[in-house]
Amino acid sequence: MDKVFLVRWYGSFNGEDALDELRLWERSHPECECNLYLIRGYKKHAKTTTHYDIGQTIQDAAKRFANQGHHINELHRISEIWVGCFANTVPDKKDISLVERMLICYASSEVGNPNMLNQICTDYAPPQNVYILSEWYNYTTLKQYERVRRDSVAKIIPDVIAYRVTEEKTSILFISEKLKKYWY
C-alpha cells in the first residue's frame, strides 16, 4: 500500500537563541505536534564544515534536544533548526521512522555521510511506494515561504520525494527540488 506524507516544516530557528525561540514557539503552538526535526550547525573548531542532524521525537523537539547524548550536543554552533509536523495524517511510530529514514538517506547522499550526525540508515529502501511532500513555513508569521535562504537546510530536502517500487521490485527515487507556482 502506498504511503503519502505531507510534512509542514516550521523555521528557521537561528543563532544562539534558536533553542529558546523553539521552546517558546512550541509552548505557544500546542496544536503543532512536531515529530521531525532538521538541524544544521558546526562542530567545535569547525570553520567551514557544516554538519546535519535529522531526527524524530515524540516529545517536544526542545525537550528532545535536552536529552542526554543527543547529537545537538556535538554542535558548538547551531545555524538553524526546522521542526516538522505531519499535516495529512496522525502518524504512528512506524510512519515517523519511515519518513525519518528516507530523509536521512536522501540527505546523506546530498551532503555526504561524514557530514551527517545521525547515520542510522544512510542506505535505506522501503518495501512500498512512499511519497513525502514538504512545505516550508515561517514560524513567526505561519506563512509559507516563497523562497528559503541559499545555505538553508531546507534547500537540501526537496519539496517532493517519491520513492517507487516497480512490479519487478526495482527501486526508483524521484525528486522535485522546488515546486513552482503555475496558477496565480
Q: What are the roles of these predicted feature ranges?
A:
Residues 1-51, 58-184:
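Boundary/linker segments flanking structured domains
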